[in-house]
Amino acid sequence: AFKRACQKAASQTVDLLAPHGYKEPSETRGESAYLIEANDHFLAHVEEGLGTKNLVADLVEKQTGKSFYREIGVDTVATIVNDLVTCGAKPISVAMHAAVGDSNWFSNEVRASSLVNGFAEGCRKAGAVWGGGETPTLRGLVDPNTIVLAGSAIGRISPKSDRIIGDVKSGNAIIFLASSGVQTNGLTLCRQLAESLPQGYGTSIGDGRTYGEALLAASEIYVSFVTECQKRKIKLNYVSHVTGHGWRKLMRLEEPFVYTISNVRQAPALFRFIMEKGPVSLREAYATFNMGVGFAAYVDPSLVEQTLSAAKDSGYDAWLAGHVTKEGSRKAVVIPSLGLTYEGDTLQVR
């Protein structure tokens, strides 16, 4: 309700763009990035938060003495720019917001420098300058032993034809790009599971890594995939950053379609471990976690091979996963091989 109230109030401020020579383009509100239109380009803006992943890093550091804050820095940038690029914008500038409850948090030099280096690494991967930020000390509001990480980014779409507008059509192919692991969503459930394990985050998940190490793998940044497609003039009808809400996020587009996923890879070891030890049902897992899929692209079937080639050449593991069909007003994600269907009313993100 609060989010909808914000969107309603925000929409009533659109007239304030005109004096600056800008306007609001159609179908931008409710998407992952907000666009502002000029004569020959669009500007894009995103604000995003990391979530609770750094709490896992804190507990793993206590157990092992190893800092994973480089990965946390990359994660923070990833969650911002992966949303920004969904509209076709190339990131220009990223800002960090790092709120602590006690300024002594920064006195742990290994942790602090790891965070700085990771954030800078994320910006380099995104092709964006780290433009600044804010490091407030919020005593009484933030726990003195933790940090709340978030940030924002500005991007640009030029030429305007590079905009990804969401013109999905029946028959479009769905291409998946692999994730590095849990990335930045579902961590609350993951932390609850750790509390029930005798060895906690030190528990082996069966692939040579501990539970903590697997959870803290740095997120993939998908900017290079989108920019490579733009360079090759491959039209992306829509893309989705698969974060919160798991595979339900595949139906984020407002227009109703049925998204059938016919090529399902085995879930990576981390997710199999979570399902077994939770236990977490198959239905809850695919509704919560990315299950090995970090990004999805929707393209004309004639462009599948070109899109897969662009993904591979820019360093991503990608595959043809399914297709889109129009079934009247129905919106759903259907995964036949798993016996799973998520109807449109299970996703509320607008």
Please describe what each predicted stretch is:
Residues 5-6, 189:
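Alpha-helical scaffold elements adjacent to nucleotide-binding pockets in ATP/GTP-utilizing enzyme cores
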Residues 6-180, 341:
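Glycine-rich phosphate/pyrophosphate-binding loop regions near the starts of catalytic domains
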Residues 41-43, 49-51, 199-201, 264-275:
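Acidic-glycine-rich active-site phosphate/pyrophosphate-binding loop
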Residues 53-63, 202-210, 255-258:
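Gly-rich Lys/Arg/Thr-decorated short loops/hinges at beta-loop-alpha junctions or inter-strand turns
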Residues 66-74, 211-220:
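Active-site pocket-shaping loop/turn-to-helix segments
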Residues 108-126, 142-147, 208-214, 220-350:
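Glycine-/charge-enriched secondary-structure boundary and capping motifs
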Residues 160-211:
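Short, acidic (Asp/Glu-rich) active-site segment that either coordinates a divalent metal cofactor
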